[in-house]
Amino acid sequence: MEKIHKKPTALQAALAVLTVLVSLFAVCFLGFFARWSLMNLGTPGGSAAGAESSLALMDKYDMYITNEISEALDGVFSVEKVYWLNDYDLVAPEPDQSRFGSSSDPTELQWLLDDAAQLLGIEKFIFHTGIQLRPGSEVNWYLDETIFAITWQEVKNYGVYTFSEVRIAHPSQMRRFLAGGTYGYDKQFVTTQMACDVNAVVASSGDFYKFRNYGVVVTNGQVHRANGAVDTCFIDDQGDLILVKRGQLNNVEQAQAFVDEHNIRFSLAFGPILIQDGVRCEPYDYIIGEIDENYPRAALCQVDSLHYLLAVANGVSEYSNMPTLHQFAARLEEMGVQTAYTLDGGQTGVIVMNDRMMNPVQYGSQRQISDIFYFATALPDGG
């Protein structure tokens, strides 16, 4: 039966607006008082841990107020909702399983692109309905008001490329998770397990920071290690990738000053940089990554604001030709990305969606690693 919506009277509309305004005043007052208390009274102990706890609590209050205001305004004013996540929360909201889907026929998916464009304001897609899928593979996707993710496989130069295109509504939906939830944890896990643990919509293996001592490692704005031997990919509070060439940040003080100045949330340290400002710039020598060998590759790319592409190249069965680094960079350039940064490939390079591995992994199985980065829904659990 179709629902009939009656137009509210002027008195009903006025009362609704008054109710919202009173609610907003109460929420904002309580949030202001809570922040004032934390800043002036602090947490017990006065330690650095206490200070960090205060910051985390203030972030939670900010997130609560923003989400409550969005809910209060819904249906009264024509105002776009804004949902965001707290960086200090280890687990993201659980995605709504009914919003996942799959198809073996890309030509049937124009409706999906249209819906994603309307919900998230996407003007340009990497995925299109004319894509030639790897034989026997499927397109997998997730769509809600805060995230669109679509994953597929193609064959290029007799090798398999797995791509996952992601558009999020808020920068906080792009996140990093360290095994054990803390820096330096002594155990490692496969990417699929960590992705499941944090409720990722889409996840990628990270830089495997515990395997080597290179690079600048940052989580939640704090520098843990600063070795400038490799290029670093920083993710700022706007969700943009900021790429820094090797040799520019060589100690913790330098790195922390850079992090503070640019509002950096976290980093990835592997490299090299492949594309910057839409121009290929991969080096011809690098300390890691088997540049000139045919090897499994992985990369994080940015298309435009809050719009990303994950890429993994593997060899499997009759499609066994893996790319050199330069061939990989050329393929990403063809995709039209503005920024591309190399991640740990080989047996490490994995893309996960809905807790399932999306790409064939070299040498038979996933490697246990120390970290992932991932994209999450910002809607409350279950959407």
Regions found by a protein language model. Name each.
Residues 2-232:
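Zymogen propeptides
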Residues 159, 171, 239-240, 302-309:
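Beta-strand-turn-beta hairpins that frame and shape the catalytic cleft
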Residues 159-163, 197-198, 269, 295-297, ...:
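Extracytoplasmic
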Residues 179-184, 248-250, 313-317:
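Short, solvent-exposed aromatic-acidic interface loops
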Residues 185-188, 251-258, 293, 319-326:
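A short, polar/proline- and glycine-enriched secondary-structure boundary/capping micro-motif
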Residues 207-286:
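Active-site-adjacent helix-turn-beta-strand microarchitecture at beta-sheet edges
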Residues 214-235, 281-338, 343, 348-383:
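Conserved, well-ordered active-site substructure
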